[in-house]
């Protein structure tokens, strides 16, 4: 009971001082039904919300298919308007059919355009600007590139500079080198006069005003009359419009037009003749035709495919014989550059000598000495053979000259003497010449027999003719005569046999193409251009031979066989 009383007291305290007014509405209820309302909503529409009822806040469900169709139609109309009103993509690409070259975009390229790519760093010739390939093309040398002969001139230190230059040299007597701003002890500076000492009459006609040439241009005298400008009401504004009466055309303003001026209005777009530039009305005025307008007979030349292009241009033509069309940078197969070798002979590391290696070294030294001795013997024999051949040729030439002199001194053969059998020479050419001389002598002797009873003068004439004929034949046959000394062929044959035996002793030889250092005790080392002898081809990749007095294995692809 006490609790209930406390609650009532609290509620009374809360409502104390507040007046609560309740409004009573006597109007119609919001939930009253309209007397004219017709409930035309079916049970299905009411349940699924398929119809909109005004005032109820209930909306009809959305038809997705109809919405999609409406959106598509609106999108099509918007796109058509944008295409009609917006910028056309064909402008700048040659027009509608791509033939209006004057409207083509400069940055638009066709299918025939070939972009020039920059070369890779491995293909760029970096020697340009440094004198070419061998550094001798001075016209291509970079201006900032200096060679080893360049000597840079460094600036002198402040303590090394000669500061007397510009002051007349070391002793001050070189007047042409004196600094213009440097003055000597004889210089006298002129100080400016004070304001009270200046003559201000200059520029006003001198001291008495009679020096007209010294009068200031802006200084006027008492006789000067200044002309003041007229007032706006006193100015004559007809100037520039033909004067007072408009008849002075030379004073008329160029921009001022009269009543007789007829302005030529620009034609409307529908009145302009757009046939100009396309050959006129009938397309036959070629001088008025637009250069970028092409007709139906125009055939555009397309760029050839990569497989159809002739890449032989610049390399001497199709068969490489047109030297005037050859590329300057194109090298032929005969322009073979010989590689320069920067090879330095390496010294093989000698192994620790032991008993076996010392014995082997002794044997190798003996073989090397033998090879050098054989080479010296062959060179000595070759020199002796050349000397003997030269001596024998000199003796044969001397004998031939003696025989020719003896023939000239001997008289013609007598009829009683029998012809002696001529010696058979070793040379066939010399044999023919001697037989020809003997035959001619026999004929001359028969002529002498028939002319026994003739006078002695005829006989002498015949003898002189015979000597002339013999001398002529000797002159003809002497340069072509070939001599052989008896026994020389056998001697040459013996020497050739000696060389064959020497070559057989060396066996198969080869020359080294590269350097090779022995990797083991059973291998040999050699340098480029060394000769390897007594080669045994024990395998396709490894052979055995002698080089520098050592016998061992070496790779076969490092050497080249000698013929």
From Swiss-Prot:
Signal sequence bounds: none
Repeat (Cortactin) residue spans along the chain: 89-125, 126-162, 163-199, 200-236, 237-273, 274-310, 311-333
Pfam families reported for this sequence: HS1_rep (PF02218), SH3_9 (PF14604)
Cystine connections: none
Domain (SH3) ranges: 505-563
SMART domains linked to this entry: SH3
Gene Ontology CC terms: cell junction; clathrin-coated pit; cortical actin cytoskeleton; cortical cytoskeleton; dendritic spine; endoplasmic reticulum; focal adhesion; lamellipodium
One function term, GO molecular function aspect: actin filament binding
Keyword terms, alphabetized: Cell junction, Cell membrane, Cell projection, Coated pit, Coiled coil, Cytoplasm, Cytoskeleton, Endocytosis, Endoplasmic reticulum, Membrane, Phosphoprotein, Repeat, SH3 domain, Synapse
Superkingdom to which the source organism belongs: Eukaryota
PANTHER family per UniProt: CORTACTIN AND DREBRIN, SRC SUBSTRATE CORTACTIN
Protein name from the UniProt record: Src substrate protein p85
Native species: Gallus gallus
């Amino acid at each position: 009971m006490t609790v209930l009383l406390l609650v009532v007291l609290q509620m009374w305290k809360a409502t104390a001082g507040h007046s609560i007014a309740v409004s009573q509405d006597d109007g119609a209820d919001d939930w009253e039904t309209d007397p004219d309302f017709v409930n035309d909503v079916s049970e299905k529409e009411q349940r699924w919300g398929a119809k909109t009822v005004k005032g109820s806040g209930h909306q009809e469900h959305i038809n997705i298919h109809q919405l999609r169709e409406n959106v598509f139609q609106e999108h099509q109309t918007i796109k058509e308007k944008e295409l009609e009103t917006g910028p056309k993509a064909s402008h700048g690409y040659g027009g509608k059919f791509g033939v209006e070259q004057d409207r083509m975009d400069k940055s638009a390229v066709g299918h025939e355009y070939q972009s020039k790519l920059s070369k890779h760093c491995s293909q760029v010739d970096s020697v340009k600007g440094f004198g070419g390939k061998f550094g001798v093309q001075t016209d291509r040398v970079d201006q900032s590139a200096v060679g080893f002969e360049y000597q840079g001139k460094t600036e002198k230190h402040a303590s090394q500079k000669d500061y007397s230059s510009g002051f007349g040299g070391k002793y001050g007597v070189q007047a042409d080198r004196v600094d213009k701003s440097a003055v000597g002890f004889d210089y006298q500076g002129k100080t400016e006069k004070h304001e009270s000492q200046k003559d201000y009459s200059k520029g006003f006609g001198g001291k008495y005003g009679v020096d007209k040439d010294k009068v200031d241009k802006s200084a006027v005298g008492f006789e000067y009359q200044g002309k003041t400008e007229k007032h706006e009401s006193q100015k004559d504004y007809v100037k520039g419009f033909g004067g007072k009466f408009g008849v002075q055309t030379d004073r008329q303003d160029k921009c001022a037009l009269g009543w007789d001026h007829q302005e030529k209005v620009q034609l409307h777009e529908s009145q302009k003749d757009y046939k100009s530039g396309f050959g006129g009305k009938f397309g036959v005025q070629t001088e008025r035709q637009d250069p970028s307008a092409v007709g139906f007979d125009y055939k555009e030349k397309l760029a050839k495919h990569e497989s159809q292009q002739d890449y032989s241009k610049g390399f001497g033509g199709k068969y490489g014989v047109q030297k005037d069309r050859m590329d300057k940078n194109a090298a032929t197969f005969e322009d073979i550059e010989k590689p320069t070798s920067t090879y330095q002979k390496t010294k093989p590391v000698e192994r620790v000598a032991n008993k076996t290696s010392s014995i082997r070294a002794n044997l190798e030294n003996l073989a090397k000495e033998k090879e050098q001795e054989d080479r010296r013997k062959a060179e000595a024999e070759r020199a002796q053979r050349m000397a003997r051949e030269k001596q024998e040729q000199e003796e044969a030439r001397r004998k031939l000259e003696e025989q020719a002199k003896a023939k000239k001194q001997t008289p013609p053969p007598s009829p009683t003497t029998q012809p002696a059998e001529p010696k058979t020479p070793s040379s066939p050419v010399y044999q023919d010449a001697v037989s020809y001389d003997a035959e001619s002598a026999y004929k001359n002797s028969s002529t002498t027999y028939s002319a026994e009873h003739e006078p002695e003068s005829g006989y002498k004439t015949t003898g002189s003719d015979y000597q002339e004929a013999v001398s002529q034949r000797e002159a003809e046959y002497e340069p072509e005569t070939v001599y052989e000394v008896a026994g020389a062929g056998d001697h040459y044959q013996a020497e050739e046999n000696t060389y064959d035996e020497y070559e057989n002793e060396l066996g198969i030889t080869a020359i080294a193409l590269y350097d090779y250092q022995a990797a083991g005790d059973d291998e040999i080392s050699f340098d480029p251009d060394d000769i390897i002898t007594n080669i045994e081809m024990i395998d396709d990749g490894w052979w055995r031979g002698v080089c520098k007095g050592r016998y061992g294995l070496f790779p076969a692809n490092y050497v080249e066989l000698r013929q």
